[in-house]
Regions:
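Boundary/linker segments flanking structured domains
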Residues: 1-37, 41-128
Length: 128
């Protein structure tokens, strides 16, 4: 994924107004990599959400991934946001992502996986 400077002009040039999807916010490392401090999603307009985040002047760069409009974009974006939240544990995400309002009875598969792993029996060698 490409890394962009987080400002209104860059967002306008790179993110179409019709997109939904996921985004990663953070700072640039000395090598130009994105050090992720926040993961999020937009179920309606990624362009608008990124501009709202840019206005906070908290992060210097972003990356994004549009959802596939031909699959189930709400589920896809929620699953990706949850995966990134659990894997990266970004410092600026203060709480677990909420499920989209359009999804009923749908929960984070990574929370379920962690719960199953923590309740699995461990043999004396520490192998599951």
């Amino acid at each position: 994924m490409e890394i962009h400077i987080l400002d209104s002009e860059t967002i306008a040039q790179n993110v179409a107004r019709t997109l939904t999807g996921n985004y990663w916010l953070g700072d640039l490392s000395s090598s130009g990599s994105l050090i992720v401090h926040y993961v999020g999603r937009s179920d309606t307009c990624l362009h608008r959400r990124l501009k709202e985040q840019a206005a906070k002047h908290k992060w210097e760069a972003f990356s994004f991934r549009p959802t596939d409009k031909f699959c189930l974009p709400l589920k896809e974006a929620f699953d990706i946001e949850c995966r990134e939240y659990h894997l990266l544990k970004p410092r600026d995400n203060k709480m677990h992502p909420d499920a989209p309002s359009g999804l009923t009875n749908y929960s984070c598969r990574y929370c379920e996986l962690e719960a199953n792993l923590s309740s699995a029996p461990v043999d004396e060698g520490g192998v599951y």
